[in-house]
């Protein structure tokens, strides 16, 4: 039963399907892990927390590109700037400073949320990244998992779950 995956204080009907699917996928792919932080970096940036196989809640933020496009549409001095993967800490001009903020700033935001969640819940979480921007946040040296196909696999798991009910 899908509701058995959700903490009693969470309203499943008010949770996006993509997030439900990612949680289901993580539990199916990594059944030996009990607690997860699933970070989906796409149009929106979402962090979803699973403790003892139960969805506890999450965070939704504008995605990196969504924020960037919104800023350049509203700030007259940066309308014609192109998005790049500049990783310098400080920019020497407006364009470089903007890229430092979006690239390093988003990475630091994610790292800070991870630290806060781990400190608050005192768990050993399996951290799973997915979404189009995820590959630029993590590198091969990190202990995090990158599953480009997490949502796609979850969709298949969810469809199988629905078929089993009938």
What would you call each of these model-derived segments?
Residues 43-45, 135:
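Gly/Ser/Thr-rich loops at beta-strand to alpha-helix junctions
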Residues 1-36, 52-166:
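Nucleotide/phosphate-binding catalytic cleft detector across ATP-hydrolyzing
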């Amino acid at each position: 039963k899908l509701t058995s995956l959700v903490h009693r204080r969470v309203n499943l009907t008010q949770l996006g399907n993509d997030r439900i699917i990612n949680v289901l996928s993580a539990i199916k792919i990594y059944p030996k892990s009990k607690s997860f932080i699933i970070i989906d970096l796409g149009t929106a940036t979402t962090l979803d927390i699973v403790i003892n196989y139960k969805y506890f809640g999450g965070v939704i933020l504008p995605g990196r590109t969504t924020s960037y496009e919104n800023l350049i549409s509203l700030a007259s001095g940066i309308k014609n700037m192109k998005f790049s993967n500049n990783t310098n800490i400080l920019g020497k001009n407006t364009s470089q400073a903007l890229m430092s903020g979006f690239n390093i700033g988003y990475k630091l935001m994610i790292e800070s949320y991870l630290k806060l969640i781990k400190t608050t819940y005192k768990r050993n979480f399996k951290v799973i990244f997915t979404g189009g921007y995820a590959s630029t946040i993590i590198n091969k040296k990190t202990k995090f998992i990158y599953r480009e196909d997490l949502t796609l696999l979850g969709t298949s798991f969810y469809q199988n779950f629905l078929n089993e009910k009938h």
